[in-house]
Amino acid sequence: MVRLGPKKPPARKGSMADVPANLMEQIHGLETLFTVSSEKMRSIVKHFISELDKGLSKKGGNIPMIPGWVVEYPTGKETGDFLALDLGGTNLRVVLVKLGGNHDFDTTQNKYRLPDHLRTGTSEQLWSFIAKCLKEFVDEWYPDGVSEPLPLGFTFSYPASQKKINSGVLQRWTKGFDIEGVEGHDVVPMLQEQIEKLNIPINVVALINDTTGTLVASLYTDPQTKMGIIIGTGVNGAYYDVVSGIEKLEGLLPEDIGPDSPMAINCEYGSFDNEHLVLPRTKYDVIIDEESPRPGQQAFEKMTSGYYLGEIMRLVLLDLYDSGFIFKDQDISKLKEAYVMDTSYPSKIEDDPFENLEDTDDLFKTNLNIETTVVERKLIRKLAELVGTRAARLTVCGVSAICDKRGYKTAHIAADGSVFNRYPGYKEKAAQALKDIYNWDVEKMEDHPIQLVAAEDGSGVGAAIIACLTQKRLAAGKSVGIKGE
């Protein structure tokens, strides 16, 4: 085997022998504060299950538990050409998915940048721009036209209420969008109208959430998939429940969606424990919540998602500075800026391979104008490990809760998102947490009964597969939503 270029030296823990007693005391205090024991995780899981159940009840609860109207499992044998449309914050992605029928698929995709003025323009400007992109894509890949309209799955990652899979009423814009005349309206007919104006052979048959897409896409290729999760700027999970277990749908469903029918549920569980009953919040978590745009909401997300990990670190470092332990006689004005430390900070610090943590030294010098001593860097490294590990241990409580609720003893959990994919050692931290919850006597993480595995593309492939399943139901005259819709 030929290795190209220098091999990165292995990460070294480094000795704590040179750390003075007063700083060691602070490190031990932080360990106590941020360590989540196996026992604590089990109590969180128990409460999580009751909150998931509450979300499915008629009364509802903190966790929305939104029915995704995917009422069939993909078999992996589905075939055909399907389109997916993914409307993100800055780009529009169009994906052609050719399902091979043997748990396999091919994809072709184009990305289109959304012009800034569209974010605050008119409803017609937005939908006609999207329709033009679709036309360009179809003309390029089907120059001879198509024999019948292409079914399209639309990944719409904005809060929308759905009574059936081929409709979705926008509740409110997020991600910097503020387009009049869309909130409170069904987005599917708005898009379909512009598609028809340009005579494009496309039918929008499904509106989906990206987490539900992650679940379905991964199940198509891997029959052991039991859940789709996103661990990135936000956190979320989706799984299949059975209709008989969803109390809030009682009496609302047509006969062809029976009590034994599966139903994909988009949990939106970032709002777990908004009452602060079980999550081990520190004073730093309280500050983050109180100074956030929506205090008292998204409690679980604020302790686990990539958006907040750097900020938790920053608040701890500020506290240590104010108490006179670190960065003595230095200008820390940059460190005082809220959210100046994003997740790349703990990520780079945990990835620093050098004994004296040179990369961390550069990071603080270049970005924050702070000179650090080796001893300070050892504390910073320990803090990054504690914050990252706590996030992983809390995150898998959601996974464990769904597995226990559904009685899964073995499962592949299809995971996606920037933290899962890029944060160093995250997969190992999560695997260790699951091992601790269940007390498994298994050494290797690849032998664990429940494993986090890399997901398939949910917003592209997942949306296309859901379009395929929905198209089949519609063609057979079956329902795709509540009675009378």
From Swiss-Prot:
GO terms for cellular component: cytosol; mitochondrion. It comes from the Eukaryota. Residues 151-177 are annotated as: Glucose-binding. Its EC number is 2.7.1.1. Pfam families: Hexokinase_1, Hexokinase_2. Residues 209-457 are annotated as: Hexokinase large subdomain. The modification Phosphoserine is found at S15. Transmembrane segments: none annotated. InterPro entries: ATPase_NBD, Hexokinase, Hexokinase_BS, Hexokinase_C, Hexokinase_N. It catalyses: a D-hexose + ATP = a D-hexose 6-phosphate + ADP + H(+); D-fructose + ATP = D-fructose 6-phosphate + ADP + H(+); D-glucose + ATP = D-glucose 6-phosphate + ADP + H(+). Keywords: Allosteric enzyme, ATP-binding, Glycolysis, Kinase, Nucleotide-binding, Phosphoprotein, Transferase. Coiled coil: none annotated. ATP binds at K111. Residues 75-208 are annotated as: Hexokinase small subdomain. Belongs to the hexokinase family. Monomer and homodimer. The monomeric form is active, the homodimeric form inactive. Catalyzes the phosphorylation of hexose, such as D-glucose and D-fructose, to hexose 6-phosphate (D-glucose 6-phosphate and D-fructose 6-phosphate, respectively). Has higher affinity for D-glucose. Mediates the initial step of glycolysis by catalyzing phosphorylation of D-glucose to D-glucose 6-phosphate. This is Hexokinase. It comes from Kluyveromyces lactis (strain ATCC 8585 / CBS 2359 / DSM 70799 / NBRC 1267 / NRRL Y-1140 / WM37).
